[in-house]
Amino acid sequence: MPFWKRKSKELGTPAHGPDFSDVDTREKALALVEKGQLEPLYLMPPEFGGAEDPRNIVYVPIGIADIKRSTDLNVIAPLVESGDLQNYSAVPEYRGRSFIPMAIKIEASDPKRFECEINIWGEALDRETELQRPDSG
């Protein structure tokens, strides 16, 4: 789902994991950054030409930015340097009116393709559990 489209339906409390449903403004997110609960994450990293711009920054629980940065620098950057990838996007997926993304989908392509999703909270964590279940067939 593109970042400018948010699910309008109120979803209630997530089944498990953290709940950022009430963090519905940038100001509330920045207050949690000040408390040490959230950190900024660059969608397009500075190493790839990403700007220091509020539209390029989302706020996530501590540690998530390191996971994305590691993926960008240790997986994608070498593939870009070898000519295997030329296009890059990192798209946040939101839950309800929350300002905190519940997942970030990273895609890089041309001529090869790389995709991954960083699941952060809410239903995105359920998707992660579904992927880990053994095939029951």
Task: Please annotate each region the language model reported.
Residues 1-28:
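Glycine/proline-rich, flexible active-site/cofactor-binding loop segments
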Residues 19-137:
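Domain-level detector of nuclease and nuclease-like folds
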